[in-house]
Amino acid sequence: SLFVTTVIDQARLDRAASLYTKERAASKGIDLHYVNTGSGDPVATLMEISGGNGYDDVVVMAPVPAVIQQADAILGFDGCLNFFSGPRNAEFSAPFNFYNVHYAAHHLVGTSGGNVDDMKEAIDLMGKGMDPAGLITHIGGLDAVIDTTLNLPNIPGGKKMIYTHLTMPLTAISDFAELGKTKPLYAELDRMVKAHNGLWNPEAETYLLAHPDEV
């Protein structure tokens, strides 16, 4: 099967490619591509990758009209555009090719996360080996919850892991090295995450929970 990831930030694209390699995907029968759509003709590039057939499913993760138009343009026959990222602007709109809705069976769906059954399925998949560590970019304690929740739209990165029995400011994993210059705990956590390709991991979690007074 074909899977293409696009973004306009090359650093993010490179990071994703280092975590989820094309070789690993190929071993599971997936033809994985990473494409920077910030330059050139992204529609032509993506259509070429698909062999000119377009895509069965296109997931739009940002409420940007130009991105929606690109997604619409690369749908294949009976293709589904999944608008995942909900906009804040109640007047948000974007052009959509309704000729293809009628003649090419294109359709649109909006999702904003999963239900309880989806969560159960996700937990089951994790138990079977799916690793969610690549999603986590920040670690914090219970005292960080309020500010993190209120300022979430302004905090970059991915998921924030909160340990409710710890007192710890929300801390980016990428900041461990700098913090480790003055706090040995963070130096040790930095060593552990670097040993796991920069990812939060059970070893680091165990160490953190065993040294709550050193945060």
Predicted feature locations:
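Short, acidic/turn-prone active-site loops that include or flank metal/cofactor-
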Residues: 8, 38-39, 85-89, 113
